[in-house]
């Protein structure tokens, strides 16, 4: 089920964060609470970043994504196969970022379903131009914001295993996902997200 969200561009500084999501998933599975994860992020620097503000930012972002997942999916991120774990992280980003979800649903899914080979610069440009026409909020962003969004979308898809490369002709990949994960997400009523991830 898709919940209406406001458009935001904070994803610019929050890529896939797969290893960070995996670390926190394992901690939550061990019984750690959210506040304890935040404390460990600062006192033990579990994300291995330089500044306190970045430690807090990553902890907040990771926990916000994990909050929309159930115990089974959190456990799968920590202990499941890597392709399915990354797909769950991608699912959590789509669930928490409206613009990224719309890009995946309106642009990436179409290419996936019809077996198109590449994700091009034009795909991004057309998508962002359309969103500027549809939303005053998006229209107020500057060119650099769109440049950074494009960069991070590409990086997320590459790190999640859905693109072979980040530069030039970005070839689309089709990861093999655990059928139990696929069916679980569909059973939650989130088939629209799963259709994107499996290309149906």
Swiss-Prot record:
<keyword id="KW-0051">Antiviral defense</keyword>
<comment type="function">
    <text>BREX systems (bacteriophage exclusion) provide immunity against bacteriophage. Part of a type 1 BREX system. This system allows phage adsorption but prevents phage DNA replication, without degradation of the phage DNA. Methylation of bacterial DNA by PglX probably guides self/non-self discrimination. When the brxA-brxB-brxC-pglX and pglZ-brxL operons are transformed into a susceptible B.subtilis strain (BEST7003) they confer resistance to bacteriophages SPbeta, SP16, Zeta, phi3T and SP02 and partial protection to phages SP01 and SP82G (these include lytic and temperate phage).</text>
</comment>
<dbReference type="Pfam" id="PF08849">
    <property type="entry name" value="BrxA"/>
</dbReference>
<dbReference type="InterPro" id="IPR023137">
    <property type="entry name" value="BrxA_sf"/>
</dbReference>
<protein>
    <recommendedName>
        <fullName>BREX protein BrxA</fullName>
    </recommendedName>
</protein>
<dbReference type="InterPro" id="IPR014948">
    <property type="entry name" value="BrxA"/>
</dbReference>
<dbReference type="GO" id="GO:0051607">
    <property type="term" value="P:defense response to virus"/>
</dbReference>
<comment type="similarity">
    <text>Belongs to the BrxA family.</text>
</comment>
